[in-house]
Regions:
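N-terminal secretory signal peptides that target proteins for export/translocation
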Residues: 1-8
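Periplasmic c-type cytochrome electron-transfer domains
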Residues: 27-564
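Bacterial N-terminal signal peptides
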Residues: 11-23
Length: 564
């Protein structure tokens, strides 16, 4: 409880001192050139396409109040960095917030663009970058939502005002009590997650520990005995924050996620990555044992994942090109980029490596950067109702097993049950004895390796993906954990990099990254650690390449990185 109170206090201080560059953010932004395939209609689809996330009913969110009495949606959530969406599916919702269902059953959710749409500001002008890492404070949003709903469960006056907004002045008999019960049912798992998962040292803007939050939601809120499905002890502090990745060319990598544990290669593998994501972002999912399903589990009876929507979103992402640098520059540095790594070059790790007609090979290397995310991948949890569940050809989950393995089985099982008709149907006892291995195709077999822990060796104990650097200029802060504010700073030895810096939308086009002065999130400053604390989650250590280049060579390299 102390952790929650401190988190809420910190987020409130940050937001109370909010001084957004409102003129730039409110004005229509300049939409950067991201290729001919990326059209306005695709953009709007990307901003609002439902993927099955269910944050809360839309009428509730509209009626919800902040502690000072103002509507929770008063500024369209701009206080957290979310961007205005004039064509939102409901008034007041920002980019990346969705609505599914009808009438009182309309549910607000989140979609890819909430975390992967960026807006930067240069000299008072805002520039929109679709598919870019969002500069949003997701932890503050989560904590404040908890803070807004909590009083409704214990304060009659607060709940009466809330209920009047939803039910009207004269609700039918029993409606108030039913609404109160529904709010309490929503709040118990949500508050359990927030109280246990949000770290004392906040992620801050532009970062989150997505992997931990996926593990926490799935194993802490979804797979316990029904109801209420909770296994609170499975929820761990989400203290390995990373920078949101950019999406352009993500579908061309043969591996995704910062540690490289998610495979790419066909539509089902892309879907596996996205189903895992939506389970972490408010999808309703409660698998149940079922002896009449060939997998021994029913993954779809209580499952809000929108498989069609997820497929459409993956198709949209493939159309997003890297943003073209919109300002004047000298096109230099290509020769330096092409040098060997030990000569200060980049191409050996970050050049395009053609794997096949569809994919690029994505190297996984330990470059000395923060190691915390790898510890998250090794976490053990109680498997709850999923004890004994398995993928075809795989071993059953034990009573205590890896959170990573639970996620892999849950995602593969859901997709197999959805796409392979015989696996989605109930059967009589004789038919249910058929082994699921017998109905697997070459394509569905690839799901069995959709999630694989990265190979850790003595030479590379903590490897992370080395992505192609197209559009890297628009993706600050740098390193996988967002611990370095600019590319200029990244070309310095770790010991000489700045120890702390503010985070926001103001951009420095010369140093290529976050400007030294920010106002968007008030006084928030990200404090990093050095190489002596490599596992802090906030270490600025590692990637000491190009540090010995001359000042002229560094400037030429930065100019070249702007045009990739």
């Amino acid at each position: 409880m102390k952790r929650l109170k401190k988190t809420l206090h910190l987020s409130s201080l940050s937001l109370a001192s909010l001084a957004l560059s409102s003129a730039a953010l409110a004005a229509a932004p300049v939409m950067l050139d991201q290729g001919k395939e990326w059209t306005e209609s695709h953009r709007q689809d990307f901003y609002s396409r439902d993927q099955g996330s269910q944050v809360m009913p839309l009428p509730w969110l509209k009626a919800l109040r902040q502690p000072d009495g103002t509507p929770f949606l008063a500024d369209s959530l701009a206080r957290y960095g979310y961007l205005p969406n004039p064509k939102a599916p409901a008034e007041g919702l920002p980019v990346g917030f969705t609505v599914a269902g009808t009438g009182a059953r309309q549910m607000v959710g989140m979609t890819c663009s909430a975390c992967h749409t960026r807006q930067i500001e240069v000299k008072g002008t805002a520039y929109r970058i679709d598919g870019g890492p969002a500069i949003v404070d997701f932890q503050a949003f989560l904590a404040d939502l908890d803070r807004a709903v909590g009083p409704l469960t214990s304060d009659d006056a607060a709940f009466d005002a809330f209920a009047k907004q939803i039910l009207g002045a004269n609700p039918p008999p029993g409606a108030r009590d039913a609404l109160l019960a529904a709010v309490k049912e929503w709040y118990e798992p949500y508050h359990t997650l927030i109280e246990r998962a949000l770290p004392k040292d906040t992620w801050g803007p532009a970062r989150l520990d997505a992997v931990s939050m996926i593990f926490n939601r799935l194993t802490g809120l979804d797979i316990g005995t029904a109801p209420p499905y909770l296994i609170p002890d499975n929820i761990k502090a989400a203290d390995a924050p990373v920078r949101y990745p950019f999406l352009w060319n993500a579908a061309r990598q043969n591996k995704t996620q910062w540690p490289g544990f998610a495979a790419n290669g066909n539509d089902l593998l892309g879907l596996a990555r996205n189903v895992g994501e939506v389970y972490g972002v408010f999808a309703t999912f409660h698998p149940q044992k079922s002896k009449f399903h060939l997998l021994g589990m029913d993954y779809l009876k209580i499952n809000s994942a929108n498989f069609h929507g997820l497929g459409k979103l993956e198709d949209l992402i493939k159309k997003i090109g890297p943003p073209k640098w919109p300002w004047h520059l000298a096109r230099k540095g290509a020769l330096i980029f092409a040098r060997k790594t030990d000569e200060g070059g980049c191409v050996e790790c970050h050049g395009i490596r053609i794997k096949d007609l569809v994919l690029w090979d994505t190297p996984l290397r330990d470059v000395g950067s923060d190691s915390r995310q790898h510890a998250i991948l090794d976490g053990q949890v109680q498997t709850g109702v999923m004890e004994g569940a398995r993928m075809p050809f795989g071993q059953p989950l034990k009573a205590t097993d890896g959170a990573f393995d639970v996620l892999a089985v849950a995602v593969a099982g859901s997709i197999l049950q959805h796409f392979v008709p015989i696996l989605g149907e109930k059967h009589d006892a004789k038919a249910a004895a058929v082994k699921p291995e017998s109905v697997m195709t070459d394509e569905t077999r690839q799901l069995l390796t959709a999630f694989q822990k990265p190979v850790r060796t003595q030479a590379d104990p903590y490897p992370y993906e080395s992505r192609v650097l197209q559009g890297i200029w628009a993706a600050a802060p740098y390193l996988h954990n967002g611990s370095v504010p600019t590319l200029e700073e990244l070309l310095k030895p770790a010991a000489e990099r700045v120890e702390s810096f503010p985070v926001g939308s103001a951009y420095d086009v010369d140093k290529v990254g976050l400007a030294a002065q920010q106002t968007q999130f008030g006084s928030y400053v990200l404090k990093t650690t050095g190489c002596e604390q490599r596992d802090s989650g906030n270490s600025r250590c590692g990637h000491e390449y190009g540090t010995s280049l001359s000042a002229e060579e560094k400037r030429a390299l930065l100019e070249y990185l702007k045009v990739l």
